[in-house]
Amino acid sequence: MFDDLPPLSHQEQQRAVEEIQKLMAEGMSTAQAIKIIAEKIRAEHKAQSSK
């Protein structure tokens, strides 16, 4: 599941954790929140790589 995630800086990791926690505070399950943020990170990395 996480093999294709790009390496993240500490700041990027912290931002991802905060986004996951926000989704969970809104009632989303941990697994779903992680999935959404992981997909977002992959999409952002793919967009940056294709430039």
From Swiss-Prot:
Disulfide bonds: none
Protein name: UPF0181 protein VV2_0310
Family: Belongs to the UPF0181 family.
InterPro entries: UPF0181
Organism expressing this protein natively: Vibrio vulnificus (strain CMCP6)
HAMAP family: UPF0181
